[in-house]
Amino acid sequence: MVPKQKTHSGAKKRFKLTGSGSVSRARAGMRHNFEHRSSRVTRRLTGRQFVSDADSKLARKLLGK
């Protein structure tokens, strides 16, 4: 019997699987140093983004789906 595939720890912290099956991610650059960025940039980086079709297959594999 083949052992079960483990979920990638880094991937489960970074990606979420939506109900429709697409993979969402947060935008980079939203951890600290906001005083050096304009409010416009900060607003643009909020919210979630979808992983591209080329990368979503790999992301799903890392999530064990």
UniProtKB/Swiss-Prot annotation:
Region (Disordered): 1-39
Superkingdom, natural source: Bacteria
UniProt keyword terms in alphabetical order: Ribonucleoprotein, Ribosomal protein
Encoding gene, per UniProt annotation: rpmI
Family: Belongs to the bacterial ribosomal protein bL35 family.
GO molecular function annotations of the record: structural constituent of ribosome
Classification via Pfam families: Ribosomal_L35p
Protein name: Large ribosomal subunit protein bL35
Transmembrane intervals: none
GO annotation (BP), single: translation
GO cellular component labels: cytosolic large ribosomal subunit
Biased composition range(s): Basic residues: 1-16
